[in-house]
Design a protein with these regions (language model features):
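Conserved Radical SAM active-site core
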Residues: 1-88, 95-111
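Extended interaction regions within the primary functional domain
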Residues: 9-13, 142-148, 167
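Generic detection of long, well-ordered alpha-helical segments
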Residues: 9-16, 95, 129, 133, ...
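Short, charged low-complexity intrinsically disordered segments located at boundaries
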Residues: 48-53, 136, 170-171
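Catalytic beta/alpha-barrel core
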Residues: 55, 153, 173
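Surface-exposed cleft-lining segments at the edges of enzyme active sites
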Residues: 84-92, 120-130, 164-172
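Conserved C-terminal portion of the radical SAM core fold
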Residues: 97-163, 180-195
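Substrate-binding surface in catalytic domains of secreted glycosidases
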Residues: 169-184
Length: 195
């Protein structure tokens, strides 16, 4: 079984102590979001878990004790760092702090177990294609020696997002092509596998 610790929330950032306790005790209860009365118990013993997948925007809270998991389980880490500031993501670290934390994570677990996520790509009057290219180039130069790959995607426009973020500029197919080509060119310059 592959255990995804970050599918519903940023567990590494907000619930590190809880997560470490679950691994120490060897089980976790999860509630089915579609059927709230259905609760399942999962055994977390290393012989039952093939790999643990982490997805986070901030691994700093768990780094000092991460070895409690990595010493026993195969792991892979997705680290999301984008161009966006607190105007878009209020709880996120600034880019410099996030990059330092990614480097520290990579030094602990090895670059082959760290993917940098630059997603989702969205456009506003402030977050233009040019700004994405500049920010991505800056980050790619610094992060290339510490990552296995970079994963990017485009924001999916759905009704709730359009309501909550009216400042979003729709991304045309031409914009997508331009962004993908630009990110690809930058990634190649720094030897980053981009997917």
């Amino acid at each position: 079984m592959i255990l995804n610790t970050g599918a519903r929330t940023d567990t590494a950032q907000y619930y590190s102590e809880w997560l470490l306790k679950r691994f120490a005790e060897g089980f976790v209860y999860t509630r089915n979001p579609l059927f709230p009365n259905k609760v399942t118990r999962y055994e977390l013993s290393p012989d039952k878990i093939d790999a643990v997948l982490f997805c986070s925007k901030n691994y700093a809270p768990i780094l000092p004790r991460l070895h409690e998991i990595t010493d026993k389980y195969r792991t892979y880490f997705h680290y999301t760092i984008t161009a966006y500031g607190r105007d878009i993501e209020p709880g996120v670290l600034d880019i410099g702090e996030s990059m330092k934390t990614l480097v520290a994570l990579s030094k602990l677990v090895g670059k082959q177990r760290v993917a940098w996520r630059y997603d989702p790509v969205l456009l506003t009057d402030q977050y233009t294609i040019e700004r994405h290219m500049d920010t991505f180039a800056h980050m790619a130069e610094k992060l290339a020696p510490y990552i296995d790959r970079c994963i990017f995607s485009f924001v999916e426009m759905y009704k709730k997002l359009e309501t909550n973020m009216p400042e979003l500029v729709p991304i045309s197919e031409a914009d997508k092509e331009r962004i993908a080509e630009g990110l690809g060119k930058i990634a190649r310059r720094y030897g980053i596998y981009l997917q």
